[in-house]
C-alpha cells in the first residue's frame, strides 16, 4: 500500500483535526479507507499490570491502522487487532518488559489509572518509519479520556492528528487540492479564518524528506543528509587517491630494489 497512502495537511504543517479524514472519506470515492493517527498525546503514559508500573509511549489510531500500514504482526489476528474500542497492540520489546515470558494475548492493562485495555496482538518494534516507535497502539477513541478536543466529531484541535488516506488503485487526489481547499473553507475553522490557506496532499514517500513540517512524525533533514553524503563521497575519493599514490610509490620502490640487486649481481 506504500504508494497509495497520502496524508492531508496544509502549507505550514501536516497535522489536522481528527474528523478531517472522515469528512474526506465521505466526500471522495477515490479513497478506499482512512486512518487518523495521533502520536504526540501518548508520550510517557503510566501503564499498570498487576503490581508492575511502567512508562510507555502510546500511539492512538483508527481500527484501520493495520489495513494501511504493513508493520509485522508477531501474534494476533491482523484483521481484528483493533476491532474492539478497548483493544491494544503491544510492541515486542514492551511485551517482554511487562509480561516476561507470559502470553500477552488477553491480558488487561491500565493506562494512567483512567482506563483499561485488553491486549489483542503483538507487533514488531517500529523502525525506519515516519510513525514513531510505540510501546502500545490503542484505538483513537481512548485519547478523549485525556483530551476531549480530539474526538472524532470535534474539529477544534487542528494540531495533533495526522490524517492518512489509502487511495484506491490508480487514484490521485493531488489534482483536487483546490476543491479540497474550498470544502475546508466552508467546514474547517483554520481555513475559514485564514490561519492557513493551502491544502496539501502529501504522499507517504514524501513525508520524511518533505517540505511540510510535522511535529508528531519522524522526519529527516534532506539538506543535512546531502551534506553528510557529500562529505562521505569526498572522504572515499581521498582514500582512493591515497591508496593509488601509496601503490605507485611502493611499485617504484620495488623497481629500484630490483635494479639495485641486478647491479650487485643478485638474481
Language model segments and positions:
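Glycine-rich loop motifs involved in handling phospho/adenylate chemistry
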Residues: 79-83
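Short amphipathic beta-strand/extended segments in non-transmembrane regions
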Residues: 6-7, 17-75
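N-terminal membrane-entry
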Residues: 216-235
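Generic structural signal for small/hydrophobic residues in well-ordered secondary structure
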Residues: 8, 24, 34, 66, ...
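Acyl-group handling in specialized metabolite and lipid biosynthesis
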Residues: 9-12, 219
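Mid-to-C-terminal secondary-structure elements
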Residues: 59-75, 88-220
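Membrane-proximal juxtamembrane linkers immediately C-terminal to transmembrane helices
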Residues: 1-9, 29-30, 72, 130-132, ...
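Intracellular coupling helices
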Residues: 239-267
